[in-house]
């Protein structure tokens, strides 16, 4: 009986940690479409997409000679 409870708690913790990135919601495509010259580096050389998004940043490795991990575009306040 205790083993079943332990397994359920472990599964809940794993699913919960996978579903959240340090409380950061995923950014929209618009927020992460930042021009090459306007990108402000948010990571380090060799950072993985997972590490980058965990830091609350955008990751895009399709543009050469630009930071791949960078701060998202600020959202306008209404």
From Swiss-Prot:
Cystines in this chain: 32-58, 42-57, 52-69
Every P-type domain range: 30-73
GO cellular component: extracellular space
Signal among keywords: yes
Alphabetized GO MF terms: growth factor activity
Pfam families given in the database record: Trefoil
Keywords: Disulfide bond, Growth factor, Secreted, Signal
Disulfide bond keyword on record: yes
PANTHER family assigned to the protein according to its UniProt record, in alphabetical order: GASTROINTESTINAL GROWTH FACTOR XP4-RELATED, INTESTINAL TREFOIL FACTOR-RELATED
Protein name as annotated: Putative gastrointestinal growth factor xP1
Organism per entry: Xenopus laevis (African clawed frog)
């Amino acid at each position: 009986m205790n083993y079943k409870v332990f397994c359920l708690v472990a599964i809940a913790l794993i699913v919960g940690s996978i579903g959240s990135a340090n409380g950061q919601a995923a950014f929209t495509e618009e927020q992460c479409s930042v021009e090459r010259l306007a990108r402000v580096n948010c990571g380090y050389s060799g950072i993985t997409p997972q590490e980058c998004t965990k830091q609350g940043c955008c990751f895009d490795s399709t543009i050469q000679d630009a930071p791949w991990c960078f701060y998202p575009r600020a959202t306008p306040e209404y």
